[in-house]
Swiss-Prot record:
PANTHER family: NATURAL RESISTANCE-ASSOCIATED MACROPHAGE PROTEIN 2, SOLUTE CARRIER PROTEIN FAMILY 11 MEMBER
Family annotation (HAMAP family): NRAMP
Role played: H(+)-stimulated, divalent metal cation uptake system.
GO terms (BP aspect): iron ion transmembrane transport
Any matching Pfam family: Nramp
Protein name: Divalent metal cation transporter MntH
Keywords: Cell inner membrane, Cell membrane, Ion transport, Membrane, Symport, Transmembrane, Transmembrane helix, Transport
UniProt similarity note: Belongs to the NRAMP family.
Compartments it resides in: Cell inner membrane
Regions that span the bilayer: 59-79, 92-112, 144-164, 167-187, 196-216, 233-253, 288-308, 325-345, 377-397, 402-422, 439-459
């Protein structure tokens, strides 16, 4: 796989370097109407695709955007819910992870369809469809979601640095600001370099969990049985709460904006036939990538079930707690190191996608373009401050509550991304011949309904939890 990716990168590197060099001169350009120009203009159609030859080479040309999107499905919020679900209920909630992954596959396929059919990302499509006031509101809640996601990345990276190197959480949070240099270097080298970096770290995460699962040796029959839905998930209030958390933490709202934009980086023919072919390959790319995300999220829960639940550790909810228990329970010190390494790779990976998502949202809604380094500094700065304040006031234990708050904020924003997406892909004026078929829209609206109901329930439970905490 790595050989094929390297060949694909070498194939179009000259085109990428030319475009990325010109992009480095861009600054704030509020006068350039984004709705009249392509999303991420400097990277638009910058990746050459093969129109002939073996299907495998054509698929390789489209591999990348789906894996960048999949990063959002493995953030520390997913880690926390997976650890809690596995330690408390064993393998029972694997069915919820599978269901939420199917939902994500459908929604990301629709986001890719919008980008390929309309040559607009979701933010641009919203700007063309809604009033100025509505667009400002959508932009504001989306920016809040991106900051919340970045907050989870700061916490995850800081915790990983603390576990691996003993770096204090506050210092680790400050160190994460340096990642702006990494983002700039990668963006300067072109979009294929970004994708290669993300995929490489995903392979690191994958490898870490493969080793940990082998060491944990979970019973295969129980693991497979966990993917079968059970009534107990709904009947048990605690299981239902964790199930809602898993679904709410899985579909990331900014991923819909991101995916609708970065699928347009491929230089496919902008013709009806070319768009239809590009859509097939883009959906294949995102489906394969989200299956990798399914494996990693399931691995977190399986690891917690095999290591903690089996040893009667039923209340493992903090990432630090899981790290401290892994080595003694498994009897292998490297298991905990691999766990923290995977967490660090996840946090670094999210840096790239969060920067792109922020740029896409700002350009699409406001017609405002900032240099990537300035955009990154603003977002990361707003994410670091709450971490420093919470740790200073409540100690390192407060990061767990802050992580939960970030997931609640993401849940609040989700309907404001899903519903506009579904309305756009069902509009023939926007989509043309690639308008979503009726059966697909029925499925998509059912998924949207489930997500909205579950997120409302999650928010209600969180509000009750806060009120109980205040009364105590």
């Amino acid at each position: 796989m790595s050989c094929c990716i390297a060949n694909a990168i070498r194939w179009d590197v000259s085109l990428l370097i030319h475009r990325s060099m010109s992009s480095s001169m861009s600054s704030v350009q509020p006068t350039s109407p984004v709705s009249d120009s392509p999303s991420l203009g400097e990277m638009h159609a910058s990746v050459a695709v093969s129109r002939r030859g073996h299907w495998g080479f054509r698929l390789l040309a489209f591999l990348g955007p789906g894996y960048m999107v999949s990063v959002g499905y493995m953030d520390p919020g997913n880690w926390a819910t997976g650890l809690a679900g596995g330690s408390r209920f064993g393998y029972m909630l694997l069915s919820v992870i599978l269901l939420s992954n199917v939902m994500a596959i459908v929604l990301q396929a629709l986001a890719a369809r919008l980008g390929i059919a309309s040559d607009m990302d979701l933010a641009q499509a919203c700007r063309a469809r809604y009033s100025r006031g509505t667009n400002l509101a959508l932009w504001a809640v989306c920016e809040l979601a991106i900051i919340a996601c970045d907050l989870a990345e700061v916490i995850g990276t800081a915790i990983a640095l603390n576990l691996l190197l003993g770096v204090p959480i506050i210092l680790g949070a400050v160190i994460t600001a340096v990642d702006v240099v990494l983002v700039l270097l990668l963006m300067h080298r072109g979009f294929r370099a970004l994708e290669a970096f993300v995929i490489a770290l995903l392979l690191v995460i994958f490898g870490c969990f493969v080793v940990q699962i082998v060491l944990a040796a979970p019973p295969l029959q129980e693991v497979l049985g966990g993917f079968v839905p059970r009534w107990q998930v709904v009947a048990d209030p605690q299981a239902l709460y964790l199930a809602i958390g898993i679904v709410g933490a899985t579909v990331m709202p900014h991923n819909l904006y991101l995916h609708s934009s970065i699928v347009q980086t491929r230089a496919y023919p902008r013709t009806p036939v070319g768009r239809r072919s590009a859509l097939r390959w883009a959906v294949a790319d995102s489906t394969l990538a989200l299956m990798l995300a399914l494996f990693i999220n399931a691995s977190i829960l399986i690891l917690a079930a095999a290591v903690f639940h089996a040893q009667h550790h039923f209340d493992v909810e903090e990432i630090e707690q899981a790290y401290q228990l892994l080595a003694p329970v498994l009897g292998v010190g490297v298991a905990a190191t691999l766990f923290a390494t995977a967490l660090l790779a996840s946090g670094i990976n999210s840096t790239v996608t969060a920067t792109l998502a922020g740029q896409i949202v700002m350009e699409g809604f406001l017609r405002l373009r900032l240099r990537p380094w300035l955009r990154r500094v603003l977002t990361r700065g707003l994410a670091i401050v709450p971490v420093i304040v919470v740790v200073a006031l409540y100690g390192e234990q407060g990061t767990g509550r802050l992580l939960l708050l970030s997931q609640v904020i993401l849940s609040m924003q989700l309907p404001f991304a899903v519903i506009p997406l579904l309305r756009c892909v069902a509009d023939r004026k926007v989509m043309g011949a690639l308008v979503a078929p009726r059966w697909l829209m029925v499925v998509a609206w059912l998924i949207a309904g489930v997500i909205v109901v579950l997120n409302v329930k999650l928010l209600g439970d969180y509000a009750v939890h806060l009120m109980v905490g205040v009364s105590d």
